[in-house]
């Protein structure tokens, strides 16, 4: 298996990496819920420029996600 790389990802692409057993829409919903429910994560993402309608996650945002959730 290829090692996870910190790079820009589509929001849905990364959501499916974290929830591979879910369909696309469920993975998106679960990923958003995790961002809100994980203490400090939402504020950290907003500080990195994340908005609710963000489609492409920057390297910095991906790094923040991995900091809070670990690698997918």
Predicted regions span which residues?
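Major-groove DNA-recognition helix of helix-turn-helix-type DNA-binding domains
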Residues: 21-56
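A short, Lys/Arg-enriched interface patch at domain edges and termini
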Residues: 55-72
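Ca2+-coordinating acidic residues in Ca2+-binding motifs
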Residues: 13, 30, 61
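Membrane-targeting and insertion segments and their boundary/processing signals
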Residues: 1-5, 9, 32-39
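Polyanion-binding surface elements
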Residues: 2-22
């Amino acid at each position: 298996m290829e090692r996870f790389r910190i790079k820009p990802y589509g929001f849905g692409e990364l959501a499916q990496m974290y929830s591979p057993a879910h369909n696309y829409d469920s993975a998106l919903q679960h990923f958003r819920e995790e961002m809100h429910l994980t203490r400090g994560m939402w504020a950290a993402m907003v500080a990195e420029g994340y908005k609710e309608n963000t489609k492409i996650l920057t390297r910095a945002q991906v790094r923040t996600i991995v900091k809070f959730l670990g690698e997918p």
